[in-house]
Amino acid sequence: MLSRRIFLTTSAAALVAGTFPARAQSAGEQAEWAQNYDGAARIRVPRSTTPILSPQALAATEEMVERYRDIVNRGGWMPLQAPASLRVGARNPAVTALRQRLIIEGDLDPAAGASPIFDSYVEAGVKRFQSRHGLNATGTLNDATIASLNVPAPTRLKQLELNVVRLRSYSGALGHRYVIVNIPAALVETVEDGRVHTRHAAGVGKIDRQSPVMNAKITAVNFNPFWTVPASIIRKDLIPKMQKDPSYLTENKIRIFSGAGQEIRPEQVNWRSDEATRYMFRQDPGGDVNSMGFVRINIPNPHGVYMHDTPSKGIFGDDFRFVSSGCVRVQNVRDYITWLLKDTPSWDREHIEQVFEAGSRTDAPLSQPVAVYWTYITAWAAPDGLVQFRDDIYNKDGLGMTAVASRGPIEPKDPDEAFMQN
């Protein structure tokens, strides 16, 4: 099983030695200008109702560019040399440096002092920092948190400048109701009347099977859908599995059909050849085994991707949710489709629950298609001044780091999940 890991396209030594500003601030300078940065007013991480794609977010991000330009002009911050797993109760000289680092971006009140003790104030500051960077807010200093802390201030400034340009490209009318999929954040937002209605953790495309940036329309919800296995998965996964376990298809409710639509029994196929690639493999409905779970959300587009439920709910609690073959898995999918179908006659929450309970194949075309924007935003801010950063997981920022604090994926507990990742 893979654990959380950090991988950099540039070495850690290069980050520390070559990328930081030549003049880093002293502790006194940091504390002095941090008073003007109003860190104390923003120690907590509020739940903003401002959509990532909105005029308000654009204006806030433009303002944050100026703030980070000021940070850079004042010398940025020192690289943090600290052991991983520092937590409440620890005493270490690195905690003093950690306090100074958190003060600069407003995650810790300067009044918290310069003690080498990792107290509850430092823990709260670390949690706030982690939340702003898409990390699990444990309050413990781990490798991923240290890597994010050590991204140089000029890099963060460039990241903000790049994303202002991206946000401006969405400055037109996006619609009365729309959906945002922010790929680097692995996050889905439903937006209505300019406010976020719901937020959902998501599973998005792997680094080598990227989710596309696109604008499209959601047209229908398929309940208890079939899943047609892609040809690449038949070749790479199903054939080897059947060679090892002839009962595999039956146990996973996967059926074989000829081009004429005739069902073929598994024992009729020569699994020691490529004969299987000539057939269609279809997994029966059933949220417990079907790779799309109980729901597929149709989005006609040239990439052949869609949104769906998943039987692998555990991914939503992980930092690293770049696990699919390009499609987007949605947490709390019932809340999501209830919102999608709210203006479609006869599709209230009660009816949706009845369809789930019945387990029957049912399609629900939306009476009004909903716009959906799959976007790539790695830095943005809210009007309250809270700035968010995410790893440049697909290396679209071009700042020299594929993922500055990438959290490695957790291998599926069930090995059969590995091939059912859409």
Label for each model-derived stretch:
Residues 1-14:
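N-terminal secretory signal peptides and thylakoid transit peptides that target proteins
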Residues 15-18, 204-205:
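A short acidic/small-residue loop/turn micro-motif
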Residues 18-19, 212:
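Proline-rich low-complexity regions
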Residues 20-24:
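Sec/Tat signal peptide C-region and signal peptidase I cleavage site
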Residues 25-110, 114-132, 136, 143-422:
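Well-ordered beta-sheet/strand-loop patches within structured domains
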